[in-house]
Design a protein with these regions (language model features):
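Short beta-strand-to-loop junctions in surface cap/lid or active-site-entrance loops
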Residues: 23-35, 104, 276
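Short, surface-exposed "cap/lid" segments of acyl-processing enzymes
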Residues: 32-62
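C-terminal catalytic histidine-bearing segment of alpha/beta-hydrolase fold enzymes
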Residues: 43, 83-85, 219, 231-282
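Conserved alpha/beta-hydrolase
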Residues: 64-80
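Alpha/beta-hydrolase active-site loop
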Residues: 83-104
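Alpha/beta-hydrolase fold nucleophile elbow
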Residues: 105-117
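Short glycine-enriched nucleophile-adjacent loop
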Residues: 120-131
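Accessory cap/linker subdomain of secreted extracellular hydrolases
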Residues: 128, 135-211, 222, 226
Length: 282
């Protein structure tokens, strides 16, 4: 067991060292003296600010082609965010986003939050529980809250008003999680956790996406090897439909894996966002 755990801890330690040097917030705004709509990016389970890497600037510049300013933020393990990924305060993350939207160069009612993987879970939660952001894009999303990453202990990933959110647990030290270190396949750990959860546990952990105030865009992968994003995106769609959700909903299901989001996908997402935001944002 020790031989299996050690590489996992080493990977986590190396990721932490890299993230600690990343800024909490990176901005790439259109600098023409006018206010523009904004897309805020949040990354996956490393919690850092992946999009702040200078190598990502050409990609970030593409948002300008669609009239969007763009920012990216870390939510743990950067210099000014919590070190631990346990019970992260959604209130604090929302307050940080609100401060970003109050910049005079941003149209405050024209903000989209685009999260990837664990960041998609976060984005859906923020849209469901707060009114700061009115358009949510969730790439490789989850319909439920999961346990905290990077810890073998059982904790919720998120909290609101100091209270941890109910969650489904995919144990870090399960066979499927540990073998994934070598195979890159973690999907079974999550599908097993979902199938073994009781109806009450699933209901309690479900993200109340019907409370989102604006458009919902989902991007999933049919061959997702990390977790079942296609099936979970379908659950989100079904919940929205069951609650007679009236805002625009788009589900882009990719014929690929967890890393198949490419420039064409990005163009589709931004074209859709520009349309659903309406003339007041463009």
């Amino acid at each position: 067991m020790k031989k299996l755990i050690t590489p996992f801890l080493l990977v986590g330690a190396l990721a932490s060292c890299e993230n600690a040097t990343a800024p909490d917030l990176y901005t790439n705004y259109i600098n023409d003296g006018e206010a523009h709509p904004l897309v805020i990016l949040v990354g996956g389970s490393d919690g850092g600010n992946y999009f702040a890497n200078p190598n990502m600037k050409p990609l970030m510049d593409r948002y300008h082609d669609y009239g969007f300013s763009v920012a990216s933020m870390g939510y743990f393990d950067t210099s000014g965010t919590p070190d631990s990924p346990i019970e992260l305060s959604l209130n604090e993350i929302d307050a940080r986003i609100k401060a970003i939207t109050e910049d005079s160069s941003i149209k405050g009612q024209c903000v989209a939050l685009l999260g990837f993987s664990k960041g998609a879970e976060l984005s859906l939660l923020l849209g469901s529980h707060f009114n700061t952001v009115n358009h949510i894009v969730a790439a490789y999303p989850s319909h439920v809250v999961w346990n905290a990453v990077k810890t073998p202990m059982s904790y919720s990933s998120w909290s609101i008003d100091g209270q941890p959110l109910p969650y489904i647990e995919a144990p870090l030290l399960s066979f499927d999680m540990l073998s994934g270190i070598f195979t890159g396949e973690y999907r079974n750990a999550f599908t097993d956790a979902l199938s073994e959860a009781s109806p009450k546990e699933l209901n309690d952990a479900a993200i109340p996406v019907e409370k989102i105030k604006g458009s919902v865009t989902l991007v999933s992968a049919r061959q997702d090897q990390i977790w079942p994003s296609f099936e979970m995106a379908n659950k989100i769609e079904q919940r929205l439909s069951d609650n007679s959700y009236e805002n625009p909903v788009l589900h882009i299901d990719l014929d690929g894996d967890h890393y198949s989001y490419n420039k064409e996908t990005m163009d589709t997402v931004l074209t859709h966002l520009k349309r659903v935001m309406g003339s007041e944002c463009n």
